């Protein structure tokens, strides 16, 4: 009866602070020891001892009943508390687990001190690795962002396939450096874009150009004189022909320059007179010369500035020029080339001329 009473007792699980390890051998040893002690007491004890043992068993039964009542009261209180708090339900379910299952679970986990030391070691070992991994991830993300930015800069997109390609104006600086700078090459000055020739309004000013380059007329006159001297000295016909052509071209150029100068002078005088008349109130609108009137005035001024001999030569030259021009415009029959009339029947190789 004593063994059954001991086995019927309720056993609670050890708390986590207890570091004793449960094993099946220890469990088997406890009832055997109790049995042996009971058997020893029963075999070697006397009759008075049996009375004492019965009294002890009676006391144990009463204590068990008291414990059962207390446990029932505790269970009733626990049920009321479970109704109030949901966490108590979890605790109640854990209390119903058998002691053997809890002991096996605790044995598989090992002592608490070892578990704590292992967890702390794992945290210490894992923390530097996590930091290194986080740094590697950040570096990779930064590299991807930079590569995406450089890719966008290198390959600009177009709005459509027909649009022109967008190209960056940035160019890398060359590694070549000029150690010795070459001397500056003297540049030729173009008189067309010379600031001395151009006016303040950036337009061509012929008066300023003539004043700035008046020495060229003297050079041309001296060149013409030298050509005439060479022409007089040379005896070769080919050289004489070339010199004659050069003299004619230079003289024509000088004559054209003088005519342009006369035209500018006549226009300046005419503008001055018209401005004076408008200022006096005799005219409201200025009169602009025609090209034909300008040519006539230029010709009159040319003949006025000539000597009598030069004037006669110029008039004779002009007369011949006009005669040749009229002869070209005249029909062939009136030129005096053919005195007789054209025959009625021409040969096969000749064409009949039409009489005007």
Swiss-Prot record:
Keyword NADP (UniProt):
no
Keywords (alphabetical) are: Coiled coil, Nucleus, Ribonucleoprotein, Ribosome biogenesis, rRNA processing
Alphabetized InterPro entries for the sequence: RRP36
Top-rank taxon of the source lineage equals Eukaryota
Coiled coil (UniProt feature): 220-330
Bias-annotated ranges (Acidic residues): 16-40, 62-87
The GO annotation for biological process reads: maturation of SSU-rRNA from tricistronic rRNA transcript (SSU-rRNA, 5.8S rRNA, LSU-rRNA)
May I have one GO cellular component term? Answer: 90S preribosome
Subcellular localization, per the record?
Answer: Nucleus, Nucleolus
- Pfam families, from UniProt? RRP36
Q: Does the keyword Methyltransferase apply?
A: no
Segments carrying the region annotation (Disordered) are 1-209, 302-356
**Sequence ranges of Basic and acidic residues compositional bias:** 130-156, 302-315, 323-338
Q: Which family does it belong to?
A: Belongs to the RRP36 family.
Q: Which PANTHER family match?
A: RIBOSOMAL RNA PROCESSING PROTEIN 36 HOMOLOG (PTHR21738:SF0)
Give the quaternary structure.
Associates with 90S and pre-40S pre-ribosomal particles.
Describe its function.
Component of the 90S pre-ribosome involved in the maturation of rRNAs. Required for early cleavages of the pre-RNAs in the 40S ribosomal subunit maturation pathway.
Q: What is this protein called?
A: rRNA biogenesis protein rrp36
Q: Which organism is it from?
A: Aspergillus terreus (strain NIH 2624 / FGSC A1156)
Its gene is rrp36
């Amino acid at each position: 009866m004593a063994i059954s009473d001991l086995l019927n007792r309720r056993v609670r699980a050890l708390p986590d602070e207890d570091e004793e390890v449960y094993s099946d051998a220890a469990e088997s040893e406890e009832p055997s020891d109790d049995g042996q002690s009971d058997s020893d007491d029963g075999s070697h004890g006397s009759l008075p001892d049996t009375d004492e043992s019965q009294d002890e068993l009676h006391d144990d039964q009463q204590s068990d009943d008291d414990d059962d009542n207390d446990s029932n009261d505790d269970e009733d209180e626990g049920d009321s508390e479970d109704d109030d708090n949901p966490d108590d339900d979890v605790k109640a379910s854990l209390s119903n687990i058998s002691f053997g299952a809890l002991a096996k679970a605790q044995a598989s986990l090992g002592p608490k001190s070892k578990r704590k030391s292992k967890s702390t070691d794992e945290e210490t070992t894992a923390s530097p690795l996590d930091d290194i991994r986080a740094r590697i991830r950040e570096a990779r993300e930064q590299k991807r962002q930079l590569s995406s930015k450089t890719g966008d800069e290198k390959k600009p997109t177009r709005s459509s396939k027909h649009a022109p390609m967008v190209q960056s104006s940035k160019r890398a600086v060359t590694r070549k450096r000029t150690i010795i700078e070459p001397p500056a090459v003297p540049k030729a000055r173009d008189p067309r874009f010379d600031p001395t020739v151009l006016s303040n309004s950036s337009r061509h000013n012929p008066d300023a150009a003539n004043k700035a380059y008046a020495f060229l007329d003297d050079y041309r006159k001296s060149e013409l004189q030298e050509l005439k001297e060479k022409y007089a000295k040379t005896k070769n016909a080919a050289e004489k022909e070339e010199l004659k052509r050069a003299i004619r071209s230079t003289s024509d150029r000088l004559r054209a320059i003088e005519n342009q100068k006369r035209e500018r002078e006549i226009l300046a005088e005419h503008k001055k007179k018209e401005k004076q008349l408008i200022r006096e109130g005799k005219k409201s609108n200025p009169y602009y010369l025609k090209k034909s009137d300008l040519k006539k005035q230029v010709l009159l001024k040319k003949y006025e500035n000539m000597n009598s001999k030069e004037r006669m030569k110029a008039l004779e030259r002009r007369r011949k020029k006009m005669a040749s021009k009229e002869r070209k415009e005249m029909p062939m029959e009136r030129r005096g080339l053919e005195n007789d009339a054209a025959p009625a029947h021409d040969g096969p190789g000749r064409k009949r001329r039409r009489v005007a």
